[in-house]
C-alpha cells in the first residue's frame, strides 16, 4: 500500500478542518436535550493547609456571566465545530491573544456533559495540554477562553509530510505519552486521541504539541470500566466497540497515531466507517515491506506492544515512555542548562504573600511560549519519569547536577510551599510561577493580567469582597480567610482605603523579600 494512496484516503476522511472537534460526531452516546436554564456554578472554596490559605488550581478559572465583548475583541474565525465556532480573541486591556470557543446551548445534545468537559479541563496543567483560562455564560451561549495555538493540526502535518522520520515521530510520541500518563494519573481517560485533536503551539519546528479537545473525556479510576461506545473509527480500541473498556483504550489510540506517523496511513483502513470498524474489531494489522522496510525493529516492537489486542497484555503508558525507541530517539532533547538562579527563585517564592503567589501563578499560565521557553525546557528535563509533574527528588537531583552539593536544610519545606494543592507533586504552572525571573513578569502589561483577574467588577481596585471570592467564598464566613485578607491589606493597601489599586499592586509585585 503506497503512501500517496493512503494519504488520499486520509484526506477524504477529513470532513472539516477545525480548531476544536466538538464531542459527539462519531459516538453512539445516549443523549437527551437539556433545558436552557442550566446555570454553571463555580466552586471557589479554598483549602486550608498548615494554617495557610491556598487555592485549588481549578479556582484560578472563573466563570463570568457578563458580556464577553466587554473584555475581548472577537477577531477572525479559526474553526467550525459541530455545535459552535472558535474565534481568535484579543484582550482589550492587555492585548493578549486567545482562542475563544463558542458553544450554542440549544445545539448541545448534552449540556451537562459539556460542563463535565469544563470541569476536567480546569484540573489540567501540563506542557502538552491546552490551557483553559476562564469561561463566560449567558442565556444562549457558553464561551471557553483558551490558549491560542498558532501551529497546525498534527493531522495536517501528516497530510503534508506523508510520514515522519523516526526521530521526529519519537519526539511527538513522547509528548503524547507524557500527556496520557498525566491524564491517567488524574484518573481521566481521554477516549478520542487522534491527530485532529492535537495542535502545535506555534509554527516553530521545535514547537510543543498540545491536546486541544476533551469532549469525550471522563473520570475513570484504576480498575474501573466504562461502557459507552465513543471515539473515532480509525483510532478507537476494539474493547470500546465491545462495550467494556478501561483507560488502556488511550494506549491503543496512541499506537494508531504512532503507526500513522511513521508510514502516512493508519493500520486499520477502509472506504467506509463500517469497513474500518470491522478491521479494528479484528485488531489485525501489517507492516508492509514497501513502507516499513527501513523502519527500525524497535519502532515496530513498540507499535506492536501498543496495539496488543488484549488490554491486559497491552503495554502500560510507563512502559511506552521507557521503551528503548523513545529513550534512544529523544536522548538529544534532554540536555538542558539549568540556571544557577533556580534555587534562589524557589526560595524567594516561599516568602511571598498569598496574593503575589497567585498573581505569579496567573502570569505563568498566561505567558507565551517564547517568554517561558527556557523554564519549560528545564521542567521537561527535570521530569525524569515523564509524569508531567515534579517530585521533590527530581528537583533535588536536578540541583545537584548543576553543582549544588550543599542543599539548604529547608529545601523540602520550600518545595512543599510550591505545591499549591498539597498533591505531593509540583505541577507545571506552579514550577513556572516559582522560578520566573522578575525581569519577565515586572511589566505593566504583564501585571495587568492578574490584576484584572482579581478586579472582578472592573472598577480598577481589588476589594475585600473580591479577595474573599478569590480566597474562598464571599457568602460564607471563614475566620482564617478573613485574617489572611486583613494581613494582606496591612501589607499592600498603602493608603488605607480598604482596597488595592494598580499602583499598590505593582509595588507589591516589585517588592523584594
UniProtKB/Swiss-Prot annotation:
Binding, Ca(2+) 3: 493, 495, 497, 499, 504
Binding site for Ca(2+) 1: 383, 385, 387, 389, 394
Modification note: Myristoylated; myristoylation may target it to different subcellular compartments. Autophosphorylated in vitro.
Coiled-coil annotated spans: none
Chain segments annotated as transmembrane: none
Keyword check for Methyltransferase: no
Record key words, sorted: ATP-binding, Calcium, Kinase, Lipoprotein, Magnesium, Metal-binding, Myristate, Nucleotide-binding, Phosphoprotein, Repeat, Serine/threonine-protein kinase, Transferase
One Pfam assignment: Pkinase
Residues where ATP binds: 78-86, 101
Protein activity control: Activated by calcium. Upon calcium binding to the EF-hand domains, the C-terminus of the junction domain (J domain) undergoes a conformational change which results in the dissociation of the pseudo-substrate inhibitory motif from the catalytic domain. This, in turn, may facilitate the autophosphorylation of the activation loop at Thr-232, which leads to the kinase activation.
Binding site for Ca(2+) 2: 455, 457, 459, 461, 466
Location of the EF-hand domain: 370-405, 406-441, 442-477, 480-513
Domain Protein kinase as annotated: residue spans: 72-326
Cofactor: Mg(2+)
Entry superkingdom: Eukaryota
Motif J domain autoinhibitory motif in this chain: 345-353
Motif J domain EF-hand interaction motif mapped to chain: 354-363
Residues at the active site: 192 (proton acceptor)
Domain notes: The EF-hand domain 2 appears to lack a functional calcium binding site.
Known role: Calcium-dependent protein kinase which acts as a sensor and effector of intracellular Ca(2+) levels probably in part downstream of cGMP-activated PKG kinase. During male gametogenesis in the mosquito gut, required for male exflagellation, possibly by regulating male gamete exit from the host erythrocytes. Not required for asexual blood stage proliferation.
Family the entry assigns: Belongs to the protein kinase superfamily. Ser/Thr protein kinase family. CDPK subfamily.
Name of the featured protein: Calcium-dependent protein kinase 2
Organism: Plasmodium falciparum (isolate K1 / Thailand)
Amino acid at each position: 500500500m503506497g503512501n500517496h494512496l493512503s494519504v488520499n484516503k486520509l484526506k477524504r476522511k477529513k470532513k472539516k478542518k477545525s480548531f476544536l472537534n466538538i464531542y459527539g460526531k462519531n459516538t453512539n452516546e445516549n443523549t437527551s436535550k437539556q433545558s436552557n436554564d442550566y446555570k454553571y456554578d463555580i466552586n471557589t472554596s479554598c483549602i486550608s493547609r498548615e494554617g495557610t490559605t491556598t487555592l485549588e488550581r481549578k479556582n484560578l478559572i472563573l466563570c463570568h456571566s457578563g458580556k464577553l465583548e466587554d473584555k475581548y475583541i472577537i477577531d477572525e474565525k479559526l474553526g467550525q465545530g459541530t455545535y459552535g465556532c472558535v474565534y481568535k480573541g484579543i484582550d482589550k486591556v492587555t492585548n493578549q491573544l486567545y482562542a475563544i470557543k463558542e458553544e450554542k446551548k440549544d445545539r448541545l445534545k448534552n449540556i451537562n456533559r459539556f460542563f463535565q468537559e469544563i470541569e476536567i479541563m480546569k484540573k489540567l496543567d501540563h506542557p502538552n495540554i491546552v490551557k483553559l483560562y476562564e469561561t463566560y455564560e449567558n442565556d444562549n451561549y457558553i464561551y471557553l477562553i483558551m490558549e491560542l495555538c498558532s501551529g497546525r493540526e498534527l493531522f495536517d502535518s501528516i497530510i503534508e509530510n506523508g510520514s515522519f522520520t523516526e526521530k521526529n515521530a519519537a519526539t511527538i510520541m513522547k509528548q503524547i505519552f507524557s500527556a496520557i500518563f498525566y491524564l491517567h494519573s488524574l484518573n481521566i481517560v481521554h477516549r478520542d486521541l487522534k491527530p485532529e485533536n492535537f495542535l502545535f503551539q506555534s509554527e516553530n519546528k521545535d514547537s510543543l504539541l498540545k491536546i486541544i479537545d476533551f469532549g469525550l473525556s471522563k473520570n475513570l479510576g484504576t480498575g474501573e470500566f466504562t461502557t459507552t461506545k465513543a471515539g473515532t473509527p480509525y483510532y478507537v480500541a476494539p474493547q470500546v466497540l465491545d462495550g467494556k473498556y478501561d483507560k488502556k483504550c488511550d494506549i491503543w489510540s496512541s499506537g494508531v497515531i504512532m503507526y500513522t506517523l511513521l508510514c502516512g496511513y493508519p493500520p486499520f483502513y477502509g472506504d467506509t466507517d463500517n469497513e474500518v470498524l470491522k478491521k479494528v474489531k479484528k485488531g489485525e494489522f501489517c507492516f508492509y515491506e514497501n513502507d516499513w522496510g527501513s523502519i527500525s525493529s524497535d519502532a515496530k516492537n513498540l507499535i506492536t506492544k501498543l496495539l496488543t489486542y488484549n488490554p491486559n497484555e497491552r503495554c502500560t503508558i510507563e512502559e511506552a515512555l521507557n521503551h528503548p525507541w523513545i529513550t534512544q530517539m529523544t536522548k538529544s532533547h534532554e540536555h538542558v542548562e539549568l540556571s544557577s538562579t533556580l534555587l534562589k527563585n524557589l526560595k524567594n517564592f516561599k516568602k511571598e504573600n498569598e496574593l503575589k503567589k497567585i498573581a505569579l501563578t496567573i502570569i505563568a499560565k498566561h505567558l507565551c511560549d517564547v517568554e517561558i521557553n527556557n523554564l519549560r525546557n528545564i521542567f521537561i528535563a527535570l521530569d525524569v519519569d515523564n509524569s508531567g509533574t515534579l517530585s521533590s527528588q527530581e528537583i533535588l537531583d536536578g540541583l545537584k547536577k548543576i553543582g549544588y552539593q550543599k542543599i539548604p536544610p529547608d529545601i523540602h519545606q520550600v518545595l512543599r510551599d510550591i505545591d499549591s494543592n498539597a498533591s505531593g507533586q509540583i505541577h507545571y504552572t506552579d514550577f513556572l510561577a516559582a522560578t520566573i525571573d522578575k525581569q519577565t513578569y515586572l511589566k505593566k502589561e504583564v501585571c495587568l493580567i492578574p490584576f484584572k483577574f482579581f478586579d472582578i467588577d472592573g472598577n480598577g481596585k481589588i476589594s475585600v469582597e473580591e479577595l474573599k471570592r478569590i480566597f474562598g467564598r464571599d457568602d460564607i464566613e471563614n475566620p482564617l480567610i478573613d485574617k489572611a485578607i486583613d494581613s494582606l491589606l496591612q501589607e499592600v493597601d498603602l493608603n488605607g482605603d480598604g482596597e488595592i489599586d494598580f499602583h499598590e499592586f505593582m509595588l507589591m509585585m516589585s517588592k523584594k523579600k
